[in-house]
Amino acid sequence: MTNQYMTKLYHDLLSNSPQTVTIDIPADMGTGQISQVVTKQGAVVSDWKMNYFSDMNVQGVSCEDYIQLLFCFNDGVSWNIADARQCVSIQKGESCIYRGHGKMEYLCYSGKTNFLFKNIKIPMPYFHKILSDYFEDSEIDAYEKKLLTGISKVSITPYMEHIFAELKDFTQYRGGLGYLFLESKVFELLSVYLSAVSYTHLTLP
């Protein structure tokens, strides 16, 4: 006989666990896949592993509702921003943080090139709440001035790589525990990243 309580509990745990959505690169275009998972607070954690048979031109609007952390673990890429005379690039071993600007971005993935990116998008209201909960006003002003008005780069550290390696373990937890573990790793990565940005670019009181 099936225990209905345990059956329902198991179903609830599964349905309330973080769900990873994976999209494969079309076979006629190349190899690889893009996967993402969303935390309870709306942060989006995604992996981009791609190798296209030929140059792939992509364009899209950078959403103003998020601040993004982009990590490049293999071949780099550059992109242009509409209405701006600037070209942004990121190379292997680099990462950058910036707020979406609501403008069109244009980039080209070179063919027969191995791309591996990890991306974390944090909703702006959530990001502001984190700053207000944990930092003094002077620190908040310094971070916002630097992070919300341009693009800051820092090198990927071994500890950042360690956090990403652990982040995948959220699948070992069911229900709310999975979300809690995932959120904790996003927090940990953000704290390490802000520390790197502050020591590299900011002079905080």
Question: Could you say what each language-model-derived stretch is?
Answer:
Residues 1-15:
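Short Lys/Arg-enriched alpha/beta "domain-start" segment
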Residues 3-6, 124, 136-137, 160:
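Alpha-helix initiation and N-capping motif
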Residues 18-20:
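Intrinsically disordered, low-complexity, positively charged segments
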Residues 96, 140-153:
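Short, cationic low-complexity segments
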Residues 120-129, 148, 155-199:
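An amphipathic alpha-helical interaction segment
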